[in-house]
Amino acid sequence: MSAISIETKKVTELTAFTTPTDSCLIPIHDGTGLKKITFANFRAKAVEGTEAKIAPLLFNNAGAHNAIYRGKSLGSTVTTAQYAAIKAGTFDDLYIGDYWTIGGVNYRIAAFDYYLNSGDTSCTTHHVVIVPDTCLYNAQMHNTSSGGYEGGAANTTAGGYVGSDMYKSNLEQAKTTIKSAFSGHVLKHRIYLTNAVANGRASGGAWCDSEVDLMCEQMVYGSGIFSPVSDGSNVPANYRVEKSQLPLFQHEPSRICNRATWWLRDVITASDFARVGGYGDAGYDYASHSIGVRPAFCIS
């Protein structure tokens, strides 16, 4: 007896085939009768328009790469190819949340070209903003002889962030660690920082060189939380180039809280600077408290 023709078999009786080639034929009914189409043509028609829709997510530029959170380990060093991609502004195979583990610290990508075209001297260098997952150490905004909290005059925001001991000396350890981890690639750029305070509000500032600095509320939360605002008569000097939330914290808010309390640079009162709480809360703290140093910096 001859074999049963495929035309007389039920679909469930056919041999399974999982590796079709472009020349394979697929039966298809167009409403007038049964026709055939090659697998290559079927596939092309099925994805028609899809590539155009997803292309913006795959473009090699800062805008596209700022829009994708991946969170991949990139190893223990930035490769020559990765630095080349950063320099070119293509950021090939680098995405928000990706990180390098160097010296036991996860240095995580927080933004691409965040400072591009900003500053009194325009930043024209393509770059990646990096934020460590953990605090590098604890330090005070205003130093005391005891090295810890002291009441009274020890808690002052006079001189703003630029006038603080954090800015003047307590960030040096972080700068040394970071410059060792990313030797020759830490970008110096210009940002506007508070250097005067009146009645517990920022009253003056200046353009400053920045390599490694504390973040501000806008970078972490996307807006000011406790930073003083205009009361209709008095306008605090809250000038800054960091006007938007870092994509890292926008895409993955859990990265804000690392279960430690750490400093931000905003002046909140005559005695308090902003901070992120260990429970994930926004807050502020006396300047003499010794809490976490979790700075941001750029590599290029």
Language-model segments: which ranges?
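Extracellular repetitive beta-rich solenoid segments
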Residues: S2-G49
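Collagenous Gly-X-Y triple-helix signature in extracellular proteins
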Residues: A52-S300
